[in-house]
């Protein structure tokens, strides 16, 4: 009798999480494998979908984050269905976190690849990446959506070399009644002039950012990266469009492509559809030319992981020996920091979306986050630490801080007079109370009497602010439980 060998049926590809999966606990549906890094609003993990065996990325967002912005990001991803845009599969509420399940891009971002290899890209590589990126932008712009944060760190590659747009934390929707948006948002060095000037902008603002990204891929960093971002903010609208530092290194086609992107007048700037017909893009080679650089970057990453794991194992060995030598009858309790087996993350602290993201730029260049420049990477590249903060360009924070300082200084120099209202007196934030020595006892007593009502007023304002943030979260959780709202 002939033996028939049964083959396991092929697992289907995950397209979207079904209703049954969404009603389960996420741990029943996924196995979380490792942390990838920190993205806009939350931590990102690599996980496997148990039913299909497909690798996914899960962004875990604390509900105390700006829920409205998170829901907007989910909404935009949910509406998109393009091979050039990172896919959204579904989301869960788990304790105090929102789990957002997205497509996993194993090669990371273009900026990761540049940093890991410590090399910029060739024209052929740039053309291939730009072609896919333009197809993604053409799709978004057709849907009347503006990405608003195009840069190498938000262009992800899968292991086959296909580029996909990611991180829609700052994306915007254009409606029929809103021809242009006026919100200042984005990453300073990549911002279009009209965005900085707040004169209204539309989809072609992304094209300017793409031109800056092309220079970033070619030179390792965008124009003005070596100067303070505050100065760059004023230079971008007033100076001529930026160009390559060494134009002679690049072909006429590539130079012209960048020139078409970096037209200061939005009305005269090329669209994504037009740029797809540009000779530089039309001559782009297939994604296979990206495989070598992807493999090289992944090899570097793997070696770093192995090195980190060896260091962890060595630390644990040393800690274990110290514990054994401590006492003949009692072993020292291992605390939170000593002897703990730390999982060697595949990426360092500065990851964005679902990829490692140590940008090449200094200081506060955050889009959805506020960045710091505490540590330096190899060469000219610096690490960017991302924390979950609402979207606010750093140059706006600079102005706000200056305004606060001016208020404090003017108060310290003012002559004390009758206190008309408790709100007239603001406590200096820098703790400098030297000016009080020049006040009379009567003035000091008036200020002292004003403290109690001022404190009650501040407490009430804080309570109202807390309630305004808390209620939408409670409403969203309740809606999720009733399954009336599926992200």
From Swiss-Prot:
Pfam families: Mst1_SARAH, Pkinase. This is Serine/threonine-protein kinase 4. The record marks 326-327, 349-350 as: Cleavage. Its EC number is 2.7.11.1. The keyword Secreted does not apply. It comes from Macaca mulatta (Rhesus macaque). It comes from the Eukaryota. The active site is at residue 149. The lineage of its organism: Eukaryota, Metazoa, Chordata, Craniata, Vertebrata. The modification Phosphothreonine is found at residues 3, 183, 340, 367, 387. Residues 433-480 form the SARAH domain.
């Amino acid at each position: 009798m002939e033996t028939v060998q049964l083959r396991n049926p092929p697992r289907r590809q995950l397209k979207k999480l079904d209703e049954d999966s969404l009603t389960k606990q996420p741990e029943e549906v996924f196995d979380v494998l490792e942390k990838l890094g920190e993205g806009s609003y939350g931590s990102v993990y690599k996980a496997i979908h148990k039913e299909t065996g497909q690798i996914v990325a899960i962004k875990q967002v604390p509900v105390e984050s700006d829920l409205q912005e998170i829901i907007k990001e989910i909404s935009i991803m949910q509406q998109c269905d393009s091979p050039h845009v990172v896919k959204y599969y579904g989301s869960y509420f788990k304790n105090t976190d929102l789990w957002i399940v997205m497509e996993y891009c194993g090669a990371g971002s273009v900026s990761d690849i540049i940093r890991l290899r410590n090399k910029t890209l060739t024209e052929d590589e740039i053309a291939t990446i730009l072609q896919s990126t333009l197809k993604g932008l053409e799709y978004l712009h057709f849907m009347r959506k503006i990405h608003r944060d195009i840069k190498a760190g938000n262009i992800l590659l899968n292991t086959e070399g296909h580029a996909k747009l990611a991180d829609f934390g700052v994306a915007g929707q254009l409606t029929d009644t809103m021809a242009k948006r006026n919100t200042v948002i984005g990453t300073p060095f990549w911002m279009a002039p009209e965005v900085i000037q707040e004169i209204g902008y539309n989809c072609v603002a992304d094209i300017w950012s793409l031109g800056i990204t092309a220079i970033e891929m070619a030179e390792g960093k965008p124009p003005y990266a070596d100067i303070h971002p505050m100065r760059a903010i004023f230079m971008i609208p007033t100076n001529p469009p930026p160009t390559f530092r060494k134009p002679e290194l690049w072909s006429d086609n590539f130079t012209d492509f960048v020139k078409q992107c970096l037209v200061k007048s939005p009305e005269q700037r090329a669209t994504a559809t037009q740029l797809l017909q540009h000779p530089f893009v039309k001559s782009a080679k297939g994604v296979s030319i990206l495989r070598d650089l992807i493999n090289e970057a992944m090899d570097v990453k793997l070696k770093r992981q192995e090195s980190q794991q060896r260091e962890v194992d060595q630390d644990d060995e040393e800690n274990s020996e110290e514990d054994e030598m401590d006492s003949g009858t009692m072993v020292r309790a291992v605390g939170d920091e000593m002897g703990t087996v730390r999982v060697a993350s595949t990426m360092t602290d500065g990851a964005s979306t679902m990829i490692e993201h140590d940008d090449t730029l200094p200081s506060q260049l955050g889009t959805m986050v506020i960045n710091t420049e505490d540590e330096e990477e190899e060469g000219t590249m610096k690490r960017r630490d991302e924390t979950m903060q609402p979207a606010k360009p750093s140059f706006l924070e600079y102005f706000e801080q200056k305004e606060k300082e001016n208020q404090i200084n003017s108060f310290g120099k003012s002559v004390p007079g009758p206190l008309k209202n408790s709100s007239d007196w603001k406590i200096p934030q820098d703790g400098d109370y030297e000016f009080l020595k020049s006040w009379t006892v009567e003035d000091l007593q008036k200020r002292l009497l004003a403290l109690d009502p001022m404190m009650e007023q501040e407490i009430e304002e804080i309570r109202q602010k807390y309630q305004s943030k808390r209620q939408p979260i409670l409403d969203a959780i309740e809606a999720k439980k009733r399954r009336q709202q599926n992200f």
